[in-house]
Amino acid sequence: MKRINKDYLYKLTNNYIKNIDISIKDHYINEYNNKGTKLQRINKINSWDNQLYKFNKKNVINTWILDRLVSKLLIKIFKVRVNIINNNIINNGQIKDIYINKPKFKHTINKVYINFNYILSSNNITINDIDNNMNKYYTSIINDINNILGISNNNNNNIINKDNISNYLSKLYNKKVIIESNRLIYHYNDNTILNKMIINNMEKHKGGLSGKYSKILRTNIPVNNSILIRNKYISSIINNNYIKLNHIINLTSYNNLNILNIYNTLNLNKISKDLLINKYIIGLNVLYKGKNLNTAGISRSIKDRLLLGSLSNKLYGKYSNFLSSSLINNNNNNLKLGSSNINTNLNINKSYKLNYIPNHHNIITNNKVNKVKTGTFGITTKLNTI
């Protein structure tokens, strides 16, 4: 790590800065002159990633070039790949990534502040899987990063490594450089880091781009992980049942267990809210699954997607009469979803006796799909969300 540090610091020597090709500076000057001669065009004070103001246009260009060089340096340093050898956590050779967003610069009269976010990421473990050994490993990496960058400890302003990047950059800027790093826990706390993570992991999943994108989001964003929400809800039920049974066995511990309040944490409405809080309901999925009783082992299933809103397909094809406000006048038999009324007088929870399921099956007729023969036919529904 120390060798890598010296290699990057070598590129930032005063000799390197002074010997930058003049044509590069002219390129930037011409680029901004083409946009106008106003100094505000090159003044980065209104930019989200740089606050800089100098009265000399040449000094502005030179400082801005130096900022871009330092930004690339920090991004390169955080591309270090670390092999984890602990077989109890991850197999040998597994790579851990360190993602960083674009650093932000703030120039004052006598100081330069450099602020950025970063996250330690692993492909095979999650936050909940981190044990004490992994915490020690993370702490070791964070300490190494702080020593390389010259970030002082919260409890001690003394930096162990005096030959750090902060001190070296201070010589280049001719003013004190303070590097402020913010370690993130979740990728979605920073959109740049989230985009880098998605791009880096896109090829690690099978299927199309939309499927890969959905899998990555479900894994890294807890509010979109329906499996995590379901398991959490089931764990709450198991835990409450355990408390209840334990109370029945030990009746003397009534006051300590507070048995009357153990189900306050369970809310049937809350789990549906958690599952749909970041999703848009766009319609229904209706699954028809049947089997011919006379022919063992043969079954068929068909899925119909009934879409509403801007993606509505109710005006086309076989769904043209399924969603209609004129089918049933009784409001008790209508389910309002968006601006349309869905005919719920179809007894979709009933098992229908059918001989077969046609390839283009339609449920819009008033006879409630009653083609009675010798088979059984079940219908299930599910919300369509994006």
From Swiss-Prot:
Keyword vocabulary terms for this entry: Mitochondrion, Ribonucleoprotein, Ribosomal protein
Keyword Mitochondrion: yes
Compartments where located: Mitochondrion
Keyword Ubl conjugation: no
Cellular component annotations (GO), alphabetically ordered: mitochondrion; ribonucleoprotein complex; ribosome
Superkingdom as given in the UniProt entry: Eukaryota
Family: Belongs to the universal ribosomal protein uS3 family.
Task of the protein: Essential for mitochondrial protein synthesis and required for the maturation of small ribosomal subunits.
Name of the featured protein: Small ribosomal subunit protein uS3m
